Structure formats: structure tokens, C-alpha cells
A protein has these predicted regions:
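Structured helix-beta-strand junction loops
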Residues: 10, 14, 30-31
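A structural signal for short, well-ordered beta-strand segments and their strand-loop junctions
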Residues: 2, 35-38
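Conserved nucleotide-sugar donor-binding
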Residues: 1-10
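Short leucine-rich amphipathic alpha-helices used at interfaces
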Residues: 2, 28-29
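C-terminal subregions of glycosyltransferases and related glycan-biosynthesis enzymes
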Residues: 17-18, 22-23, 30, 43-149
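A generic structural signal for short, solvent-exposed coil/turn residues
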Residues: 26-28, 36
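Residues immediately flanking
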Residues: 5-6, 39, 46-48
Length: 149
């Protein structure tokens, strides 16, 4: 990602809950100041040390809640403080449905299923995997971490 210094400075301070690159991209998109260039602007090599692992730090359902569901909810709510558009409203509804489903609130399963278009794979995973017994859930998480699922 490349950004004009003045624009980046105008978005300060960065919130602690959000990765800085994500926050900058979100704010620029909300301002209508983002574009995609097909041709590379810099030489860049992706390697294992600079990629975030899938389900890093998740070994049980409580970890999943804290690191996947709650982090997303915090991020969406933080974004909602600086912008408003339909996709963000969908993300907020999906996030609330994820929390309701995790806590097995009445209507949580149905609400999450209705919002599946926001992220189909995660929705299906949460609808079913979170209802598995803990040993099977842990096994499923290990398969996801290894790239099998």
C-alpha cells in the first residue's frame, strides 16, 4: 500500500484495535481516495515471516471468541465511529449475529444464517464448529491451521 504522507497524517491517531494498514485503507476508502493499480509499484516478496497465520493463537472456543469474533466486532465498531455506509452496517449486523450465535442466544443461529452472504465460509464454520464438543473443535482448528480445511 502506498499513500500520500499528508493523507496518512490526517488519519492520526491510529486506534489500538486495528492494524494500521487496514485502518489507513479503510479511511481512504471511506473518503473515496483509494484505487487499485494492476502494475506493481514496488518490489515485494511474500514469505512466511510476514504473513499472519490462520487461527493464530486459537486453541479452544474461548480463544476463538476473543481472537476472531470479538476482535472483528471491536474493529467494526471502531470503523463505525469514523464512517457510515451500507457494507459497514452489514458487517455490524453480521458481527452481532456472530456474538449471539456464539453465546447461544435465542435467534442467534438464525440471525447468523441470514447474514451468511457477508462471509459464507466463516458463517458456516461458526454455525457448526462452535457446536462441536471441545476435543473435536480443537481438532478442526488444528486442521484449519495446517491448511487442510
Amino acid at each position: 500500500m502506498v499513500m500520500e504522507r499528508e493523507r496518512a497524517l490526517s488519519y492520526l491517531p491510529f486506534p489500538n484495535e486495528i492494524v494500521h494498514d487496514h485502518y489507513l485503507a479503510f479511511r481512504a476508502a471511506a473518503d473515496g481516495a483509494i484505487d487499485f493499480l494492476r502494475e506493481p509499484q514496488l518490489l515485494y516478496r511474500v514469505y512466511g515471516g510476514n504473513q499472519t497465520g490462520v487461527m493464530t493463537g486459537v486453541s479452544d472456543k474461548t480463544d476463538y471468541l476473543k481472537r476472531r469474533i470479538q476482535v472483528f466486532d471491536d474493529r467494526v465498531n471502531r470503523f463505525a465511529e469514523v464512517a457510515s455506509f451500507p457494507e459497514l452496517e452489514d458487517a455490524k449486523r453480521w458481527s452481532r449475529a456472530r456474538l449471539a450465535n456464539f453465546h447461544r442466544e435465542k435467534g442467534g443461529f438464525r440471525a447468523l444464517w441470514r447474514m451468511r452472504r457477508v462471509n459464507f465460509v466463516t458463517t458456516v464454520f461458526e454455525l457448526f464448529a462452535l457446536r462441536l464438543p471441545l476435543p473435536i473443535f480443537r481438532f478442526a482448528i488444528r486442521l484449519v491451521q495446517k491448511g487442510v480445511l
